[in-house]
Structures are given as structure tokens and as C-alpha cells.
Amino acid sequence: TGAILKEIVNLVGSDRVRINYDTANAIFYGDVDVVQDLGACMDRVGYIHLKDKAGGRKEWDFPALGKGYVPFPELFAMLDKAENHSPFSIEIEFTAAGPKDLAEVNQAVLDSARYLKEHGFVL
């Protein structure tokens, strides 16, 4: 969870060590409300791993951005308010079976890029 990661980073005691926050893993592994969880560690976040989550909490289902239930607009607003300009990466893991083919991967990347552009990001 963000609180645990913040505790670890604080124990290191270096401004060069930051949290790489993974939005969907916080739900899948941490069973937390991602908005509250990110808020708990925002001041120590240095990188954001954007990954959406669909299906049940422990179901391996990570679709294109905007196709799951991670509240990205709320997270983006929190980051803006905190003046946290950490870089992002996008991860799309699909389901446990993986993508059907390269066309599905390409479409998921396009959908994710479109989603970010719709929310004001320049790619």
C-alpha cells in the first residue's frame, strides 16, 4: 500500500528515493481505495505506473486505460492539486490468458493514448 511504501522510503532517508506508485496493483495486491491510498503517500511519489483494473479485486484483468474502474480523473486532479508532476508509464496486462493477438495490443495502446488525450495530456 502507499502507506507502507511511504514508511519504507522514509526509513531510507534520501530525497533521491521515491515511490513508483502502481494504480491497479494497489487494488489487486493491497485491497485499498486507490484515491485514499495515493493521498496517503503523495508527497513521496516520484513515478506513476498507470494501469487500469477490471473484474474482481483478485481477478487478473488489466485493460486499456479507461476500460476499467480506476478513477483516473480523480487521481489526476489529486496530482495536480499536490503539484506532483511525476512521469507516467502505461501498463496493459489484459487477462490471465494475455492478449488475443498483436491487433488487440495495438488497439489497447491506441485506446489508452486516446483516453489520456481526452483528459488533457499531450502525448
Model-predicted regions and their roles:
Residues 2-21, 27-123:
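Histidine-acidic metal/acid-base catalytic patches
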